[in-house]
Amino acid sequence: MTTSILQDRAMLATLHISQWTNRKHDKTVSAEVERNHQATDAGRYNKQLVDRASLESIAKVASAARAYHYKVTLPWGDNGDRLLPGALFMDYRNEMATFKGRFSSEVSAFLTRYPMLVQDAYKRLGSLYVATDYPHVGEMRSRFAIETSFAPVASGNDFRVNLNDEYVDQIKREINERNAALQRASVVDCWTRVRTVVGNIHERLSKADNKFKDTLIENARDLLDVLPALNVTGDPELAKIEKDVRDLLVPPQRLRDDATLRSETARKAEELLARMGMSGQSLSLETA
């Protein structure tokens, strides 16, 4: 697929999440430990400034937002950009707006408790307590954020710097070659996700005494819900295997109650794994 076609089908999405670390390096204690043990460069003592549990709800929202971001995007380079299919943009924007709202609410709740948490820390830390370790409430709010940004997929044809034609052509080729490699990597990522959910189904269902959670099937369903959109390169083999994986989406309780159905589903999963083998990766490298 050419970059120009990909530019029509997808964009780059970046997710930035910041949170207060709730840690502070105590140089005095670190030096004291080294003196007591006659050690050098032995480590760092980091204080936990407030009760860890007070930040858990914020961390959970951040983790869920990050998981969703990775679920509906594909890898694209190593600078934090991810490839977001245009077909998923509206869902992405709405979901992220929800995450941002939840995140803001949890941060506000934390800030309401923050003065009391600092007082508790004064008692808990004893002589390790240092007032300047704790930002003011107004500054603390700025330590938390969920931000998203979007950009078009770059193309060699977009490069228009005033240079010698020879250098311009070379840079354009390098950009297009890099894009081609990134496209291949994005398709391989799709195949890896498919193999993972099918492999998990086979592993858990192949033995009658293996227990499994409902998420075994739910995770596969979640992937298939976005896989057609993630297949931005139009890989026909990926589209074909997606339909076959849907046959594995049997209600979990039926699989627990019906040994024959469970065995048959495990067999289908095994056949799909055999069909994919390493072919999923090789096919995607050829068709990307």
Model features per residue range: what roles?
Residues 1-141:
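Leu/Val/Ala/Ile-rich N-terminal alpha-helices, chiefly Sec-type signal peptides and the beginnings
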Residues 3-4, 25-53, 158-170, 177-192, ...:
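Charged, low-complexity, helix/coiled-coil-prone segments
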Residues 204-207, 211-288:
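C-terminal structured domains
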Residues 51-75, 138-154, 185, 189-192, ...:
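Amphipathic, heptad-repeat alpha-helices with coiled-coil/zipper character that mediate oligomerization
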Residues 85-208:
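Long amphipathic alpha-helical segments with strong coiled-coil/leucine-zipper propensity
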